[in-house]
């Protein structure tokens, strides 16, 4: 079998930097899928991505598609011929569809009888005849949310396409992709190297592009070069570069030929909180800040240029000139904000709506203050500090700095609180209330901050669910999934003794206590019928349409939603789905307790006796489900068979033995002990007839199984384990 390397490059206008890597890897994955579907063998696929190009190189691609045989089975021989041996209409119709006569059909013997069959051999095509469609299909399946048209073309793509090059070895694959004919011409860097040049062989890519066009097409090569040179520049300046992975990849996507340079700004700007300076350096300018060994920001930054002049002075000064006004703004906002205390900004929160049915940010602040205090009492935090932090939690949203640099919310509250003389725990809590901000982010360090963070998240979850705005599909405008998972992480990883039902119930009660006439819209007043009190069971003003919603209904919805977040969390940790389902079946509402059960069941699943006991529990569940009547306690004197007496004694002994462990939440120890039941359980089912004719005997045996099941259900429903 002969092979050749295959290259396809799509030359475009500047591609969205945050989407570049995803587009490139998806393109490679799609090409691979199309090649596999076509039955074409290859050794490896490489992908390339630069601001104005996507490329895929297939190594050692077979130049000929293999032939294949298609088998089309017809009716059974018994149904293909009548009693006289003549073909039936069914057989003739099938044969006609195959383009043959019944007599030309072959026969195949199976364990279900003999069948008519027609085999057709399809000769494989030369690979070069297939590649145009393969590439077109791969591009059509790219994740492009908003494709665009350009010029007078009817085709659509993420950006206008200017060149297409497809080479199988040295042979140009002729065809048209996205309205552009395939050609050998590829484009180089906008400002460096040759603007256009021809490529003769797929093997020349990407080196030819670098040599002639001054473009480093390999995304990972550019990324590694930027990282290494940035770290070296920072070291030379006596510091360490702050290089986040997401920003590094974005910068890599912005340049074709990276030139890493260092610049500086005036030291007077260091009087402004570093977070504000870093926000504008990273977010607006795509610069890498530099810190000293003690974590203090240095008056230097690193940037990556797309050109490489002999004297970079003009480029460096230009970047310093660009960033200076932004830093000056931050300095001005900071000095202006310091003139007014955070607490004095509380009245302004009345002017900002949190949500139309849920009131203003001041209403939310009042609820957070009270809920944070309640949570603080339960987790052993300082209640007064938690309430103070809750009261001030949203005040920094009214500052000039946060209005201009939105991502500094929380951290600027911390700096302003310190300036105002607030307690350090209160100040830190203003920053940590938003933690964790994303998957894998750190958690609040103090219990006071944890109380405020939880109060904020539970207030949002309760309110938004209360008005019927739960996430649907991928839409989650209030980030409720993130809030739920963040709350669960705080409770579980800090092992806090909190119950979801209890916290959500308190959050509901606060909505009721703090509501007022301007929150009660016309539909609610109409539904209440003019009564001064809500109907029984309707303890909040939440409505959906014109209907008041019972508290318990929404409590259940929020709890179920939060417990559902556990599934994704544990699956990311590699825990089996059936383990999670086993615990979810018991619906424990204390997250730390839920976690302990998952860890215990995950451990139990590794034991030798787990599979047999899971199957036995499934059998027990089926038996008890059919029992119908109420089942009493075990009567040892009523046991007849040795096997049933042995199991009865074992479960009664273990029921007493595991109770202290259950109380301690040591579920791993509980299941370790219950694992010893395998032998008596197996013996019971091997030697005892549960549905005995004697009603008393039958009821006692059901009681044994009911007690057995109850022991396991104190931890999880292990009958769902696979």
From Swiss-Prot:
Name the catalysed reactions.
tRNA(Gly) + glycine + ATP = glycyl-tRNA(Gly) + AMP + diphosphate
Q: Name one GO biological process term.
A: glycyl-tRNA aminoacylation
GO terms for MF: arginine-tRNA ligase activity; ATP binding; glycine-tRNA ligase activity
The protein's location, in the record's own words, is: Cytoplasm
- Fetch the Pfam families from UniProt: DALR_1 (PF05746), tRNA_synt_2f (PF02092)
Q: Which PANTHER family match?
A: GLYCINE--TRNA LIGASE, CHLOROPLASTIC_MITOCHONDRIAL 2 (PTHR30075:SF2), GLYCYL-TRNA SYNTHETASE (PTHR30075)
What is the primary gene name for this protein? glyS
What is the recorded name of this protein? Glycine--tRNA ligase beta subunit
Under the subunit heading, UniProt states:
Tetramer of two alpha and two beta subunits.
Q: Which family does it belong to?
A: Belongs to the class-II aminoacyl-tRNA synthetase family.
Query: EC number(s) in its UniProt entry?
Result: 6.1.1.14
Keyword line:
Aminoacyl-tRNA synthetase, ATP-binding, Cytoplasm, Ligase, Nucleotide-binding, Protein biosynthesis
Q: Which GO terms describe its cellular component?
A: cytosol
